[in-house]
Amino acid sequence: SATALELFHNFALIHDDIEDSSEMRRGSQTLHRIHGIPLAINAGDALHGIVHQVLLENHEKLGAQKALQVHQHLNLVMQKTFEGQALDIGWVEKEVFPNREQYQQMIVRKTGWYSGRGPCQCGALIAGKEGELFESLGDFGESLGIGFQIRDDILNLTESSESSAPEAQVGGYGKEQGGDFAEGKRTLITIEMLERLNPEEQNRLQSILLKARTEVKEEEIVWAVEQSERCGALDAARSEAQNHAQRASSELSKMPQGSPRKILEGLLGFLAEDRKV
């Protein structure tokens, strides 16, 4: 089950990088940059097929009924993730700037399900836990996943470049510091910025986000990163990440003591670290 979840994760990232025209992933060039879009799409499709094969083989360890439950739940996770991705891509394609409520609907589906709720609830199904504990694990995972995503968005603006190689750069900048601006990402940070900047600054930020990635200049990224700190958008995002950590902690407190809870506490501890990111 864990293998299937990780294979799905990698399949989704391959396609996500193509859809976002991303240049870098985990410090290296994205698959489609190395092998081209057609082969990368095919690799993602192949992983998708392997996911279901792995889940079908689950009956040998879990029994037919439990294996079917896990398979059905992971299918739901995929569906929710694709719904969230459709919202995210649609905003960029249609030049839409979402409000906070719309962003929440997207992030719950795109990130909350596949990175948190889905894995936690799959574990609950395997352990034969249903009812209140099943829901609490899902709520814990959702808050944890969204919190991690917000921290990742913050790190995108505060961390130094992953690579200074020419091939990692697009429009003078790549998927390094501020890469989300180059890709036109609609994140919690951009929503906060558009609420806090003056009209002239709002127009400039929107014009950057609407540009093709290859047209975004380095000085525009530098300006946007500086404004995110100056206007308080980064601090607001840090606060929201902490709110999600607190929600996750509240759900975790409902779970029985033991080694599984300690593992989850370790994940939560990283998210709840009171440090600037």
Segments (PLM) and residue ranges:
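Mg2+-dependent prenyl diphosphate-binding active-site environment of isoprenoid biosynthetic enzymes
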Residues: 1-202, 243, 265, 269
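Residues at alpha-helix boundaries and the short loops/turns that link adjacent helices
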Residues: 8, 61, 215, 231, ...
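Alpha-solenoid HEAT/Armadillo repeat architecture
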Residues: 60, 195, 210, 253-257, ...
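A short structural micro-motif
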Residues: 77, 143, 211-215, 230, ...
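Short, contiguous acidic/charged loop-to-helix segments that flank catalytic cores in large enzymes
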Residues: 176-180, 235, 255
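Mobile late-domain/C-terminal helix-loop "cap" segments
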Residues: 197-253
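Short, amphipathic C-terminal "tail helix"
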Residues: 242-244, 249-277
